[in-house]
Amino acid sequence: MWPPLLLLLLLLPAAPVPTAKAAPHPDANTQEGLQNLLQGVGAGGDGELRADSHLAPGSGCIDGAVVATRPESRGGRPAVP
């Protein structure tokens, strides 16, 4: 006789594996922004971040998301940590 747990497993359908189409596709602006942010921190930048609540149309972000961005450069030398 088969154990009840094994019979139950045979009756349940297998969970489908998510396809590559189910994964979110980050846009180029998001990837470029993150790359610039990491390069700025690694290069001894001023370390100042601000939160932007505005979103670019078609960015794929949900409404109300907060995006951390680096402020525009004001020239001069970077701050020394």
Swiss-Prot record:
Keywords: Secreted, Signal. It is found in: Secreted. Residues 1-22 form the signal peptide. Its main location: secreted. This is RBAK downstream neighbor protein.
